[in-house]
C-alpha cells in the first residue's frame, strides 16, 4: 500500500500551499492540448504566468478557499494542465515498467495519479493569502530543449523553494516535474513509493492501489 509518505512529509502549511497552489498538485487525464499557432512563451515567463493566475483565482474564489474539490479540479484543468506533459510525468514516476504498460493501463494510471495529486494537496489552497512568487535567474541557452525554472514562494515565514522542469514541444514549453524543497516529485518521491508496489503487484496493482487511495480521500 502506498503511504503517500512525501505528500504528508511535505504537508506543512507552507509546503502544501506551494505545491497545491502553484502546480497541481501536482500535479494532473492526459494533459497535452492540441498544438495551436501562438507565440512561444519563454519557460520562466510561463511559470510566472501560471503561478500568478492560480494565486489570483484562489484569492478571488471563496469556494476554492473553502475546499470545494470540483472547483479545485476545474482550476487545475483550466490553468495548469494545458502546460503540463502529464504523460511524461506519470512515466517518470512509474519508471521502466511504463514501457510495457498497455495503452489502457497508461490511461488509467494517468487518471488515478492526477486525482491523487489534486486530492492530496487540495486542502492547501485554502491557505493561499498574500503569497507571491519570485523567479530566480535562469541558466539556459536559446537552443536548450529542457530547462529548470527556479522560484521562491514568499509570504509569511521562510521562502519556499519550488522549481520546475520543462521541455520544449511543438505546442510550447511543458512542465514535467516539480521540485518542492529539494525533492523532485515524480523522479524521486512518487517513483520511490510506486516501485515496491509494482514489484509486488505489477502495473494493475499500482492502479488498484491508487484508486483505493483516491476513494478513501474522497470520503474524508
How would you describe each model-predicted region?
Residues 31-39:
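Sec/Tat signal peptide C-region and signal peptidase I cleavage site
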Residues 40-121:
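Early exported N-terminus immediately downstream of N-terminal targeting peptides
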Residues 49-52, 67, 75, 81-84, ...:
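Extracytoplasmic
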Residues 13-19, 23:
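N-terminal export leaders
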Residues 118-160, 210-220:
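Surface-exposed, charged secondary-structure patches
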Residues 1-13:
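N-terminal secretory signal peptides that target proteins for export/translocation
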Residues 159-189:
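Short beta-strand edge/turn micro-motifs at domain boundaries
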Residues 179-220:
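Low-complexity, intrinsically disordered terminal/linker segments enriched in charged
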Amino acid at each position: 500500500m502506498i503511504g503517500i509518505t512525501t505528500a504528508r512529509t511535505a504537508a506543512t502549511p507552507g509546503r502544501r500551499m506551494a505545491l497545491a497552489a502553484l502546480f497541481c498538485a501536482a500535479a494532473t487525464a492526459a494533459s497535452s492540448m492540441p498544438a495551436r499557432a501562438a507565440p512561444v512563451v519563454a519557460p520562466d515567463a510561463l511559470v510566472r504566468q501560471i503561478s500568478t493566475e492560480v494565486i489570483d483565482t484562489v484569492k478571488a474564489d471563496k469556494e476554492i478557499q473553502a475546499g470545494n474539490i470540483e472547483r479545485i479540479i476545474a482550476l487545475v484543468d483550466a490553468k495548469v494542465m494545458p502546460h503540463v506533459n502529464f504523460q511524461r510525468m506519470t512515466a517518470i514516476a512509474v519508471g521502466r515498467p511504463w514501457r510495457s504498460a498497455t495503452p489502457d493501463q497508461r490511461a488509467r494510471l494517468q487518471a488515478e495519479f492526477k486525482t491523487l495529486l489534486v486530492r492530496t494537496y487540495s486542502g492547501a489552497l485554502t491557505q493561499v493569502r498574500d503569497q507571491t512568487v519570485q523567479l530566480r535567474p535562469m541558466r539556459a541557452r536559446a537552443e536548450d530543449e529542457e530547462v529548470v525554472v527556479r522560484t521562491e514562494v514568499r509570504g509569511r515565514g521562510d521562502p519556499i523553494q519550488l522549481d520546475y522542469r520543462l521541455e520544449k514541444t511543438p505546442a510550447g514549453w511543458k512542465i514535467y516535474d516539480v521540485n518542492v524543497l529539494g525533492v523532485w516529485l515524480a523522479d524521486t518521491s512518487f517513483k520511490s513509493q510506486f516501485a515496491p508496489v509494482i514489484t509486488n503487484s505489477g502495473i494493475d496493482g499500482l492502479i488498484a492501489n491508487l484508486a483505493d487511495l483516491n476513494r478513501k480521500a474522497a470520503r474524508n
